[in-house]
Amino acid sequence: MLRAAAAAAAVFPSRFAAAPAVAAVEEVRSPLLRVLGALRGGRVSTLGRRARFCSNSAGSDSEAAAAEAKAEDAVAAEGEADGKASSAIVPTVLRPEDCLSVIALPLPHRPLFPGFYMPIYVKDQKLLQALVENRKRSIPYAGAFLVKDEEGTDPNIVTSSDSDKSIDDLKGKELLQRLNEVGTLAQITSIQGDQVVLLGHRRLKITEMVQEDPLTVKVDHLKEKPYDKDDDVIKATSFEVISTLREVLKASSLWKDHVQTYTQHMGDFNYPRLADFGAAISGANKFLCQEVLEELDVYKRLKLTLELVKKEMEISKLQQSIAKAIEEKISGDQRRYLLNEQLKAIKKELGLETDDKTALSAKFRERIEAKKEKCPAHVLQVIEEELTKLQLLEASSSEFNVTRNYLDWLTVLPWGNYSDENFDVHHAQQILDEDHYGLSDVKERILEFIAVGKLRGTSQGKIICLSGPPGVGKTSIGRSIARALNRKFYRFSVGGLADVAEIKGHRRTYVGAMPGKMVQCLKSVGTANPLVLIDEIDKLGRGHSGDPASALLELLDPEQNVNFLDHYLDVPIDLSKVLFVCTANVIEMIPNPLLDRMEIIAIAGYITDEKMHIARDYLEKNTREACGIKPEQAEVTDAALLALIESYCREAGVRNLQKQIEKIYRKIALQLVRQGVSNEPTQEAAIVTASEEPNGGDSANKLKDETMEDPATENAAMTNADTASKEASELDLLKRTVDHDVHPAETPKEAVLTDSALSTDKLCTPEGNKDMEGAKEESADKAVEKVVIDSSNLGDYVGKPVFQAERIYEQTPVGVVMGLAWTAMGGSTLYIETTKVEEGDGKGALVLTGQLGDVMKESAQIAHTVGRAILLDKEPENLFFANSKVHLHVPAGSTPKDGPSAGCTMITSMLSLAMGKPVKKDLAMTGEVTLTGRILPIGGVKEKTIAARRSAVKTIVFPAANKRDFDELAPNVKEGLEVHFVDTYNEIFDIAFQSETQTETS
């Protein structure tokens, strides 16, 4: 019997330990235990910790008895715990073999075999209450008996659930007559509501009825008939059962875990348990299973079980044949599909194709066929599913249009299509320099990107953020970068964007749903590696539709945008090859998580020299051509451009400068038109061109084509075009002169007609050529004079100067010091003025004006305190601050001012007033000061340096911590300046009042 127990453990390895054997039965998924899977998560497993597999009465060895005793002790302990909460207290647990009278439970579907769990639902509340009471009284047993079919019904025909309802209504003898006599002693392991979980122990047989409601019967415990475990016939039969189960396993994966576990230990088994196991997991008829349960002869029981598993084998073979037939049918369908495709092609060639759905499907398949090798597998799967769905939908349904639009977007995207990048660093440098002057930091970063791509052989997407004032070229540099890299360019502005769907797309459930901007970008450019410019990222909105800044986190994260998910497409898109360039004016407005994903490149404002280059080489030239004015007709001198920059356009960028230049050339164009100048080619010029070159039109086209094909000939072509235009203008002027001299009294219409004929005759004769040359010489004296714009007449075209000279004093008086400020318009000078209001013992005070912010007011208070300490150290006998009320003012009172960088300037102004000494001439300073006199770093070094140069300042004082920022400036910015870098205010005092300094001249 030790071998029998081991075999049972092999068959039910978890049954002998605890309830996890329910998982094995669940894997079997036999009809008997289909409902049991719902209990695996909690209810059965908790009960299984104390429920034990009950041995059959035939197994009388000590180990089986010990297992039963342990189970009974566990049940007794539970009953004792439950009994404390009730009035009935039973000190011991009834053993299974002592159960001679049990409550009868009807089983409608399958019999319960010993060693298996089964959940049933008890609808009779009285019966359910009796089971609960028995369990509390430590009698957790009941008899489970299979219900017979009604007389006159075929057991092989499935009926409705009405019979089940009638069983619940039966009581007493009526119910007893419907039950099979042989059943199973079941332990009640769990009661949850009306669900009762039973564990089979041993076979029972009803002898008589004890009670009608609930039905209670007397039972006899059945034992297997004695058998010889070494009998060859029994062994052979059991081996055949195991072999059949193995074949079932090969044919079907059903019950895989259970059969493998059992057959691994085929030498250690218990024949009765093997028979019960095979019958229990089979899907046989319930009455055949009942026959196995009733059979006490082990050999006969094995034979019955063998018949059942053989039937399962036949079912598996039938399943295989069905699967094979289906596969053959699918192959036939594929053949039919190929023939249909050929038929469609023939119809298409003959013009007989009229099915819109078929045409749409063909169009989508044709699109994706070219991208099939590069398109991800999951996208192809979605497309195939949607195409199948499209064929099943009616063309008039709304879902048809949704599916069609979805397929249109899916198939049009450039899956795996990348444009060939240009990794030529010199070519990129040339393009960037052609389009933009300056911006060395941006150009250097792009060249680094190209260099890395050249070494790797491929490039990865990056996220770059260009920050700077308006008009410095942040947006336009994006196009130049795309041209230098040979990438497609796409720009979309997110300024004021408050809807997440603009980035991530709409769900397809919404009417009029559209993909997000990134998907639209890929469709527009046709490549998967464009350069995307996200403009004004610092001005993202936030509304009820979500936070777009948070939606951009996934888009602008190189680790996440490999699988960017658009709500509309709902399939991952690879954006790892996209180069993102963002622009912002104030990076402090960008959320920190988003800012962390970007590489910041700060673009400072342009200095005067840079603006001059940009105006002369780009703005003035392009504006003149856009207005149709030739270089010989108008000129804007360098002096005019310099005055325009200094007095009208002091902002950091050049956008306003471009507007002013456009304004100048518009007025020049109006002036030229009023003088009768026209640059349009005349009819006579066309006649001359045609007479000189017979194939004039073809030559022009040829010249154009050659210019497009060979960039080296572009300048020559432009020169030829300018020459032709100039000759046409001179010819037009000649015509007007001849008209005026020859036909002064004719009406305009007659004059034009006569002149046209006359001019044509003259042009066709040698005499005409001589007259034309003479007319040219005569018209040269009468030609319109060239319009020249210089600083003297600039006001006639752009109005009065907007900015006056920032420098008010050649030599600052006592109490006045020049500071340096930094605004959105760039750098500027800022005077700090201090004067004494009132004097008297103990009247020391400070008054502030000039629309100062809180930070600047606090800085003034600190300056007042530090100034008193400095004065006490330098001139102990001077009691100015103790006895004087001081008024500090910052001019331009209508302009709000704030910031700590004027601290050292305020101290110097107060000390100048206190000592009665003016500061050094041509001196400007900036720096935040602490109460201990330390000078802290400031921002905007370049802008402040430019402002100082504009005001003819010779000496500048900067904090020592800003030396690195100053060293990075261009040489032309630092040229001619005496710069001091200080750590404490005492150094500034020596520079401002004693001129004993250690300087650094740049």
Swiss-Prot record:
In this chain, ATP is annotated as bound at 468-475
Spell out the reaction equation it catalyses: Hydrolysis of proteins in presence of ATP
Gene3D superfamilies on file: 1.10.8.60, 1.20.5.5270, 1.20.58.1480, 3.30.230.10, LON domain-like, P-loop containing nucleotide triphosphate hydrolases
Q: What else is known?
A: This protein may be expected to contain an N-terminal transit peptide but none has been predicted.
Name one process (GO BP) from the record. Answer: mitochondrion organization
- So what does this one do? ATP-dependent serine protease that mediates the selective degradation of misfolded, unassembled or oxidatively damaged polypeptides as well as certain short-lived regulatory proteins in the mitochondrial matrix. May also have a chaperone function in the assembly of inner membrane protein complexes. Participates in the regulation of mitochondrial gene expression and in the maintenance of the integrity of the mitochondrial genome. Binds to mitochondrial DNA in a site-specific manner.
InterPro entries found in the cross-reference section = AAA+_ATPase, ATPase_AAA_core, Lon_bac/euk-typ, Lon_lid, Lon_proteolytic, Lon_Prtase, Lon_prtase_N, Lon_prtase_N_sf
Q: Does the keyword Hydrolase apply?
A: yes
Enzyme Commission number(s): 3.4.21.53
Q: Which residues form the Lon N-terminal domain?
A: 102-313
The record's keywords, sorted A to Z, are:
ATP-binding, DNA-binding, Hydrolase, Mitochondrion, Nucleotide-binding, Protease, Serine protease
Top-tier EC class:
hydrolase
Residue stretches making up the Lon proteolytic domain: 811-995
Quaternary assembly: Homohexamer or homoheptamer. Organized in a ring with a central cavity.
Please tell me whether the keyword Oxidoreductase is annotated for this protein. Answer: no
Active site: residue positions: 901, 944
For molecular function, the Gene Ontology terms on record are: ATP binding; ATP hydrolysis activity; ATP-dependent peptidase activity; sequence-specific DNA binding; serine-type endopeptidase activity; single-stranded DNA binding
Q: Which GO terms describe its cellular component?
A: mitochondrial matrix
Which family is it part of? Belongs to the peptidase S16 family.
Annotated signal sequence range:
none
Location relative to the cell: Mitochondrion matrix
Name of the protein in question: Lon protease homolog, mitochondrial
